[in-house]
A protein has these predicted regions:
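Short helix-loop capping/hinge segments that flank enzyme active sites or metal/cofactor-binding pockets
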Residues: 74-94, 254-266, 313-367, 415-429
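Structural helix-boundary/capping segments
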Residues: 38, 112, 116, 164-271, ...
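Short glycine/serine-rich loop/turn segments
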Residues: 74-214, 267, 378-397
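Acyltransferase
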Residues: 25-30, 59-62, 275-299, 322-328, ...
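An N-terminal boundary/leader segment
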Residues: 1-56, 66, 290-292, 351, ...
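Residue-level signal for inorganic ion chemistry
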Residues: 32, 54, 224, 262, ...
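Short, well-ordered beta-strand elements within core beta-sheets of diverse protein domains
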Residues: 13-20, 98-102, 212-219, 342-347, ...
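Serine-dependent amide/ester hydrolase catalytic core
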Residues: 13-19, 268, 303, 322-411, ...
Length: 464
């Protein structure tokens, strides 16, 4: 193994070397575990360490390669997963103390796909309680690798921290209202939130069924896409998994963004983003234009109602997901999740239906916008990553700010690709996103990869 460890390789480059016998999966894994032992005490991103299981996986993979067998596209790649995905024989806590003894009997479809592709699963990662808003005992918040005093995101906090902190080569996360995008922004990761239905949710702990998306974190868009290409696709055990072919993401990475029509709503962004964020976005758009994209000014449909409607839709569906344990075990729930569940339980059918109708109207307006452009460029966070102290005093304005550029696209189900495009005066990451048409993740990947071929923000690493 290189002295630099797995962090020195791309996902596909590492897998090729393992498959060719130039590196062994066992050596790659031990190098990765050495980094975990060195860095994890400062980061606190892991709930369940899976190293012994991983060692058995790596040994089996090396034996197959020694016999001359063909192996999958993620051969030997160390990947960590958010602790909402079932792994047979291990607990799926979903960040909740009441689920510490909830032992999975089968594997999630995503886990099956990863292991069939040769990935080595190393850990189950930290998250907020019930995949929602706050970290609760016995599972503390992981620490931002750039600054322990700053927020690490929610709910896929462990996935963002582990990826940027060097605990894995790539990670699996999920998003319901911003839970991939916000940790990517807080920690400076590249990530993909695919279209709703692109990835099976079988064996995944549910927050809100029609809002939940499983996605990927990595150090580059190309790496995140390589992992997404493995976990995506139809699944007979999840009838909501779309019956659509998975794009050729390797071809997309090579294609570039020549001819892409990129929309930007300058007024909407200016109303919700500070100067540093807006300036960094302008620079990113200029790079994409230099790479061949055409930039067009657009008007995004009003998202004001969507931010708050998201909470109502999420609340009702979360109440359904927790009906076996709430309110029966109310004392085991934290205040944020309790508040959401109570909202869901008291909402009338007419109120909920009104939210669904507005949701469909918004989705239709976005779809109409995407007949004029291929993608939208926008921030993820419109303000600097907040401190942990500030997060203890969140108000409605801050909540709206967090969700302005995220949860409307969870209501609509449109895909997004997220990547770093700067750093602020405190040295913390600035991140932007490209949002596109349903099931056209490959267009976004092509543009994101083109941007990262021209810039090096995604290559910058915190000193640990």
């Amino acid at each position: 193994m290189s002295p630099a460890g797995p962090e020195a390789y791309t996902v596909t480059g590492l897998a090729r070397r393992v498959a060719a016998g130039e590196l062994t999966a066992g050596a790659v894994l031990e190098a990765q575990l050495a980094e975990v032992d060195r860095r994890e005490p400062a980061l606190g991103a892991i709930i369940t360490d899976m190293r012994e299981r991983a060692r058995a996986q790596a040994a089996a993979l090396d034996a197959r390669i020694a016999r001359g067998e063909r192996v999958g596209p993620l051969a030997g790649v160390p990947i960590a997963i958010k602790d909402i995905l079932d792994v047979s024989g291990l607990p799926t806590t979903a960040g909740m103390g009441i689920h510490r003894e909830r032992i999975a009997r089968t594997d999630a479809t995503v886990v099956e796909h990863l292991e069939a592709a040769g990935a080595i699963l190393t850990a189950k990662l930290a998250l907020t309680e019930g995949v929602y808003a706050e970290h609760r005992p016995p599972f503390p918040a992981p620490r931002n690798p750039w600054s322990a005093a700053h927020w690490s995101g929610a709910s896929s906090s462990g996935s963002g921290v582990a990826t940027v902190g060097g605990l894995c080569v790539a990670a699996i996360g999920s998003e319901t209202g911003g839970s991939i995008k916000l940790p990517a922004a807080a920690n400076g990761a590249s990530a993909i939130k695919p279209s709703w239905g692109r990835v099976s949710r079988h064996g995944v702990f549910e927050l809100a069924a029609t809002l939940d998306h499983v996605g990927t974190f990595a150090r580059s868009v190309a790496d995140a896409a390589a992992v997404l290409g493995v976990i995506a696709g139809p699944d007979p055990r999840d009838p909501t998994a779309a019956q659509r072919p998975v794009p050729d993401f390797a071809a997309a990475v090579a294609r570039g963004c020549e001819g892409l029509v990129l929309g930007i709503d300058t007024a909407w962004i200016a109303a919700g983003a500070d100067r540093e964020t807006a300036t960094a976005l302008d620079a990113a758009v200029a790079e994409l234009a230099a790479a061949g994209a055409t930039v067009r000014e657009v008007r995004v449909p009003d998202v004001t109602d969507m931010i708050w409607d998201w909470f109502g839709v999420c609340a009702v569906q979360t109440a359904l997901a927790h009906r076996d344990t709430f309110p029966a075990r109310r004392d085991a729930y934290g205040p944020a999740l309790t508040q959401l569940l109570e909202l869901g339980n008291r909402m009338s059918g007419c109120e909920y239906q009104q939210l669904l109708l507005r949701r469909e109207d918004f989705r239709g307006r976005l779809n109409a916008l995407f007949t004029t452009v291929d993608a939208l460029a926008l921030p993820v966070l419109g303000f600097p990553v907040p401190t942990c102290a500030r997060m203890a005093e969140v108000d409605d304005d801050m909540i709206a700010g967090f969700h302005r550029f995220t949860c409307p696209f969870n209501l609509s189900g449109h895909p997004g690709v997220i990547m770093p495009n700067g750093s602020n005066a405190e040295g913390l990451p600035i991140v932007f996103q490209l949002v596109g048409r349903h099931f056209e993740e490959d267009r976004l990947v092509a543009a994101g990869a083109a941007y990262q071929q021209r810039t090096d923000w995604h290559l910058r690493r915190p000193v640990l």
